[in-house]
A protein has these predicted regions:
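Residues immediately C-terminal
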Residues: 29-30, 66, 127, 282
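Structural signature of FAD isoalloxazine-binding scaffolds in flavoprotein oxidoreductases
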Residues: 33-35, 52-53
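Membrane-embedded transport module
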Residues: 1-22, 42-216
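Generic signal for short, ordered secondary-structure residues
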Residues: 30, 46, 60, 185-186, ...
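C-terminal transmembrane module of polytopic membrane proteins
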Residues: 131, 199-289
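Cytosolic catalytic headpiece
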Residues: 1-29, 35-39, 81, 102-103, ...
Length: 289
């Protein structure tokens, strides 16, 4: 047995040396150390009201094994939040960059209504589906994350935004060439180009949602399956195709009914995000080792 102040000193000493601490307790004397720990754990059955109030987590069954499951669930939720944020920020950055490039060269690549559709329809369902992704195999093998680390993905968002933007501009150039026999972007006015750019960006973001199932690991090695993500991706793809192919919707959005050749090119450009991101992940894992 030790005094309450000794428990607090032990917790503070570990934290001062950069370790993540967890403290369990059930009595009033445990409250100070539970409050000072990174994760304060109170007992739901035998614990006092004081310890329950200061604790970050309360064990309803007083079973220490429950702590492991709770930590794993917390890590899974945190991972999924980061995945969804990275997915959405990368998509939004690509839209900003694409519009910026088109402004420099004096042409319209995507109209406001197109961007609104991508944000509300194309991105919405996959982002929600990423929130229910199962935990990765190495979830409990990782070291505790640094509390100072932000929830944003940093460099990954930047390169992914640039990648999607580049693919979108290339798609516009190809569509412009089909319509006007030129790849020039200066003052270009092409309904073919706008349609292919919209389709490429939309599908690239749909494919990218599968990349985001793991921020560092290969998606081809994941043992679990996210059926909700598959459903969300298929729904987004159907809606995106419908807005281009259904005449009254296409007229409302200013799209041209593209042929199978243009559709295949857009699909190929969009799908390229999967192997490209896989290569980047491979390099990141090699550097980390």
């Amino acid at each position: 047995r030790v005094q309450p102040e000794h428990k607090t000193r032990i917790v503070n000493a570990w934290r001062k040396n950069g370790y993540i601490t967890a403290m369990t307790g059930d009595g009033v004397n445990d409250a100070p150390s539970i409050k000072n720990a990174d994760i304060g754990i109170g007992m739901g059955i035998t614990g006092t009201d004081v310890t329950k109030n200061v604790a970050d987590m309360v064990l309803a069954d007083d079973n220490f094994a429950t702590i492991v499951g709770a930590v794993g669930e917390g890590r899974r939720i945190y991972d999924n939040i980061r995945k969804a944020i990275q997915f959405l920020l990368g998509s939004n950055m690509s839209e900003v960059l694409s519009v910026f490039v088109s402004s420099i060269f004096g042409f319209v690549i995507l109209k406001p209504v197109h961007l609104l559709w991508i944000n509300l329809i194309t991105d919405c369902f996959p982002a929600l589906a990423l929130g229910v992704e199962k935990g990765e195999a190495d979830l409990m093998e990782r070291k505790p994350r640094n509390p100072k680390d932000g929830i944003f993905a940093g460099v990954d968002v930047v390169y992914q935004g640039i990648l999607f933007s580049a693919l979108t501009v290339v798609a516009f150039m190809i569509g412009n060439c089909f319509e006007h026999d030129t790849f020039s972007l200066f003052n270009a006015d092409s309904s073919h180009g706008i349609t292919m750019a919209f389709l490429t960006m939309s599908m690239a973001e749909i494919f990218h949602s599968f990349n985001m199932r793991s921020q560092r690991g290969s998606i081809f090695k994941l043992k679990s399956h996210n059926k909700i993500l598959w459903g969300a991706a298929i729904l987004s793809l159907i809606l995106t195709t419908a807005v281009i192919e259904i005449p009254f919707l296409a007229n409302a959005f200013g799209f041209y009914s593209i042929g199978l050749k243009e559709y295949a090119i857009s699909l190929a450009l969009a799908f390229s995000v999967i192997p490209i991101v896989e290569v980047v992940k491979l390099i990141q894992r090699a550097i980390k080792k």
